Structures are given as C-alpha cells and as structure tokens.
Amino acid sequence: MARWRRIVALGGGAWGTALANLAARAGAEDVALWTRDAAHVAEMTATGVNARRLPGIPLHSALRPTTDLGVVAEADLILAVVPSQSLRGVLEQIQSTLPTPTPLILCCKGIEHETGLFMSEVAADVLGDQPVAVLSGPSFAEDVARGKPTAVTLAAYDGALAAALVEALAAPWFRLYHTHDVRGVEIGGAAKNVLAIANGIAAGRDLGASAGAALIARGFAELCRFGRAFGVEMGTLAGLSGLGDLVLTCGSAQSRNYSFGHALGRGTSINDARANIGLVEGFFTCGILNDLARAKGVDMPIAQAVEAVLAERMGVDEAIATLLARPSKAELAGF
C-alpha cells in the first residue's frame, strides 16, 4: 500500500465519502476529500461525519475535508467522484497542478451531454496521456460505507495499472475485479441509468414484477447490442459493471434513476421529480445515448421510449403502449 500514500477524492457526495473512507482504511496515510462548499467542509471537519450526504458514518482519522484543489499536486492517486456532466470542469481546474504520472480513477457514470464522449474520453481530452482507470459496478455508497459485501470492476487499458490500483481501495467487504475493457465498463455504467428510469416508470405505474423482469432482460439485450456496436467484450457487459449494475439500479428505490422513473410513473411532472430527487444521471445521458445508438444503427426501443417521455413527445401510458405494440420477433434477433 506504500505506493498510494496520498490520495485525493474529488467530490464530497456519498460515493466520494465512502471511497475516501475505503482508501484511508486500505492504508493511505493522507486522504483529502475535496468539495467546493466551504461550509460543508467546516461541518465535516467539526463533526467528523458527512451528515449532508452520508449521515451516521464516521470519517476515518486519515481523511481530511478540504476546499483546496492544490492538494492534487502531492497526490499519488486521484479519485474523480463528481457528477459526469461536471467532470470536464473539475479536470480543467486541476490540469496545471496534476503531476503527469499520477493515476486518475473515474468513479462517475455517464456520457458527456454536449460532446457524446465517455468519461475516459473526457479525461483524455483535458489531460492528454494521464493514466486513467474507471471504477463501476453494482454499489450503493451506504452499503459500502457500512461494510456490506460489494463487488465492482476497475478497468484500465494498462492491465498492470488496473491490477495495482485494486489495492488502493480493497477491503474485506469491497471486492474489486480488474479488466482492460474500459469502454465496456463505461457503457454498462451509462446505459443502465437510462434503463433504470424505464423500470421505475413501470413500477410507478404498478405494471407488476413480471413487467419489471421483462424490462431488465430486454434492457440487457439493448445494452449488449449497443456495446457490440462499440466493439466491447460481451463478457464485460454480462459482468458486474453491466448486468450486475443493471439489476441493482433497476430494482431499488436507493437508485435515483429508478426513483425518478417511479415518480414519473406516479404522475409527477419531470421538473418536480428532478427537484425532489436531485441529480439524475440518466436524465442527462438518455438523449446522447440514443443519439449514439442511432448513429450506430442500434435498435434500443426501451431507451427510445424513455427519451420520448423525457422530451415530452409522449406521455407515460403512450410510451408503454408503443412498446407493447411492437411486432413479435425471435427473442435473440439482433442480440
């Protein structure tokens, strides 16, 4: 663990806090948890708890909240745990300070709305040849913070780097598998948020458990078709960062994407649902995911139905009826 003595987690949310605690527990001597909110930093420093985002979980003694982005200059490892649409701005702020050999683990899931770039592409666009890895998989911050068994995937094009980075976050209850299939891991993490909105809508509309299971299975087929168009490994999509994350996100009220869809299914307006739930990554990813699918000639009817609802081209009931009216076909057609 001596290799990762100084770690910086960019993002003071629940997931950033949980990962910062893991890094401290894994042996890092100094873990800086950065957020731009000075009042939030003062609260965490005074109480030893991130009461706003992860209440009831003590901060490790090696963890120090800060608003100073200059801490990245001395870091051995950076965890980027900010919303996907904010990643570029944060990386631009640290670009001149970040030492070139310092690895960056991207812990956000999505596609940049304005450019259609995946998170690793955003990092490359801003930072050039900085070593980058991606962390994704079925995980809720509270589960990890409370020591509940969780398994995730860490991907880097450099397989040796991926294997080495595992030790920075490993814990008896937090198991990391590594891979070189960065794009496959990113696709799973981005697409599942959109599909979870569909499952939430179905649950909110009280369509039943059978409909929910069908949406997961057919959503996974869409995920696989999309991934194949990008040349990713099917085993990655069938693993933790693909199917695993899809199942978790599509079946739990802890998921903001699922909860957002559930609210829409209950008749809540899009604006009210967003205001009540907070950041919904799938809301921002949906349009660009479908744009990429259309550009690649990939059929994604569930994702397209969600897009139509979010763009207010269709109501919830019309979108459901449209999916149910699709012609019957062989189950594995196009899979």
Swiss-Prot record:
Function: Catalyzes the reduction of the glycolytic intermediate dihydroxyacetone phosphate (DHAP) to sn-glycerol 3-phosphate (G3P), the key precursor for phospholipid synthesis.
Keyword NAD listed: yes
Record-given protein name: Glycerol-3-phosphate dehydrogenase [NAD(P)+]
Catalysed reaction, written as an equation: sn-glycerol 3-phosphate + NAD(+) = dihydroxyacetone phosphate + NADH + H(+); sn-glycerol 3-phosphate + NADP(+) = dihydroxyacetone phosphate + NADPH + H(+)
Family membership noted in the UniProt record: Belongs to the NAD-dependent glycerol-3-phosphate dehydrogenase family.
One Pfam family, short name: NAD_Gly3P_dh_C
SUPFAM superfamilies to which the protein is assigned, alphabetical: 6-phosphogluconate dehydrogenase C-terminal domain-like, NAD(P)-binding Rossmann-fold domains
GO CC term, one of those recorded: cytosol
Broad class of enzyme this protein falls into: oxidoreductase
PROSITE patterns cross-referenced by the UniProt entry: NAD_G3PDH
Keyword Transmembrane: no
EC number annotated for this UniProt entry: 1.1.1.94
Keywords per UniProt: Cytoplasm, Lipid biosynthesis, Lipid metabolism, NAD, NADP, Nucleotide-binding, Oxidoreductase, Phospholipid biosynthesis, Phospholipid metabolism
Classification via InterPro entries: 6-PGluconate_DH-like_C_sf (IPR008927), 6PGD_dom2 (IPR013328), G3P_DH_NAD-dep (IPR006168), G3P_DH_NAD-dep_C (IPR006109), G3P_DH_NAD-dep_N (IPR011128), NAD(P)-bd_dom_sf (IPR036291)
Species the sequence originates in: Beijerinckia indica subsp. indica (strain ATCC 9039 / DSM 1715 / NCIMB 8712)
An example Gene Ontology molecular-function term: NAD binding
Binding sites annotated in the UniProt record for sn-glycerol 3-phosphate: K109, G137, S139, K192, D245, S255, R256, N257
Gene (UniProt): gpsA
Subcellular location: Cytoplasm
Residues that coordinate or bind NADPH: W15, R36, K109, A141, R256, L279, E281
BP GO annotations: carbohydrate metabolic process; glycerol-3-phosphate biosynthetic process; glycerol-3-phosphate catabolic process; glycerophospholipid metabolic process; phospholipid biosynthetic process
Coarse class of the protein's main subcellular location: cytoplasm
Active site: K192 (proton acceptor)
Pathway per the UniProt entry: Membrane lipid metabolism; glycerophospholipid metabolism
